[in-house]
């Protein structure tokens, strides 16, 4: 029993759970429906716990999924509220019950379907969460490409499966203190990055575009890389841009990105190129803006951001989020 409702295992009412999962997926923008459908898969294979939140005497119901991490707390992956009069207090009630049952909620999705973002934002900020918004962008197919810089001592070559260890090492240095690792599968930075790189190189969920996935060198030293993929919608996508922190700010990231865009333009001349970044990534945002990437409108949103607990963030080594830090890093 919670402050305003009851959280029960989905097995108590499987038919209602299935209906809500279907309604949840249909409520999302078309580009995000795969994220909604993933909930059913994760529930069936036991990857997430799933519950129904009901309020006695009320038609309101919420579908919620989460994962508990011993010694760390709870992460909420999905939330869908089906209510004639949705209230953000329903969210605070659910988080309170989950915190009591599984441990403090240190992270939750920002895709809180059925709730007003304008009402949820001040509530979560007051509860001590910081919003990490994803900015989905495209480089339009008809837009002229800036020239690849000829200054600098960088060289590039196509990435090969044998580069796995090199990519993991660059990633671990580049992602040290990265806040949204709290949304990654295992919360083990090296393990999660190793799994991601291995899956990308093996052509896992999305096809890797080898001709536009490049490794950058300063002399013989690998200093950065970009992975480009071809999602199911057929539009090329810059999936990962990583530069060793020791070489950041020297122009290698810009040169590498422009070289990749040049390769993608040659391979897919009539298609836009997608790229997503976290709004707090000020340096990345400046680079992508200067190159010519343009934000997509909200209704074409393709990725899901997060709300992360300040208490969890300040425990991350080298995290840029400190007590008193503003929501957008200011």
Language model region names:
Residues 36-98, 102, 218, 226-236:
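Conserved donor-binding loop and adjoining core beta-sheet/short helix segment
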Residues 1-20, 155-182:
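A short beta-loop-alpha structural element at the N-terminal edge
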Residues 25-52, 182, 186-213, 217-218:
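Active-site rim helix/loop that mediates acceptor-substrate recognition in acyltransferases
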Residues 85-100, 243, 249-263, 286-290:
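Conserved acetyl-CoA-binding loop-helix of GNAT-fold acetyltransferases
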Residues 107-119, 245, 274-285, 302-306, ...:
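Conserved beta-strand-loop-alpha-helix junction that forms the acyl-donor binding cleft
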Residues 1, 70, 82-154, 158-160, ...:
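Acyl-donor-binding surface of acyltransferase catalytic domains
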Residues 113-133, 254, 279-297:
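Conserved active-site alpha-helix within GNAT-family acetyltransferase domains
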């Amino acid at each position: 029993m919670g402050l305003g409702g009851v959280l029960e295992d989905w097995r108590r009412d499987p038919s209602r759970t299935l209906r809500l999962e279907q309604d949840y997926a249909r409520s999302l923008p078309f580009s995000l429906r795969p994220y909604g459908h993933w909930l059913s898969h994760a529930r069936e294979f036991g990857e997430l716990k799933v519950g129904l939140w009901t309020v006695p005497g009320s038609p309101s119901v919420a579908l919620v999924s989460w994962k508990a991490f011993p010694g760390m707390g709870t992460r909420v992956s999905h939330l869908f509220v089906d209510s004639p009069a949705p209230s953000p207090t329903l969210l605070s009630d659910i988080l309170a019950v989950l915190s009591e049952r599984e441990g403090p909620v240190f992270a939750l999705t920002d895709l809180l379907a059925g709730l007003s973002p304008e009402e949820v934002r001040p509530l979560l900020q007051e509860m001590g969460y910081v919003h990490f918004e994803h900015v989905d962008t495209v480089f339009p197919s008809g837009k002229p490409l800036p020239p690849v810089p000829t200054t600098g001592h960088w060289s590039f070559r196509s990435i090969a499966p044998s580069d796995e260890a090199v990519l993991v090492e660059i990633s671990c240095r580049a992602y040290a203190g990265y806040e949204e690792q709290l949304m990654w599968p295992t919360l083990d930075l090296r393990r999660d990055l190793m799994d991601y790189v291995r899956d990308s190189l093996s052509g896992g969920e999305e096809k890797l575009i080898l001709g536009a996935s490049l490794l950058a060198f300063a002399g013989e030293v690998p200093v950065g890389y970009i992975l480009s993929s071809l999602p199911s919608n057929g539009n090329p996508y810059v999936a990962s841009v990583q530069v060793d922190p020791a070489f950041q700010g020297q122009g290698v990231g810009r040169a590498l990105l422009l070289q990749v865009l040049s390769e993608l333009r040659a391979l897919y001349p009539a298609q836009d190129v997608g790229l997503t970044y976290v709004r707090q990534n000020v340096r990345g945002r400046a680079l992508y803006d200067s190159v010519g990437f343009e934000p997509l409108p909200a209704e074409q949103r393709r990725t899901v951001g997060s709300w992360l607990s300040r208490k969890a963030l300040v425990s991350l080594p080298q995290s840029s989020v400190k007590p008193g830090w503003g929501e957008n890093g200011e």
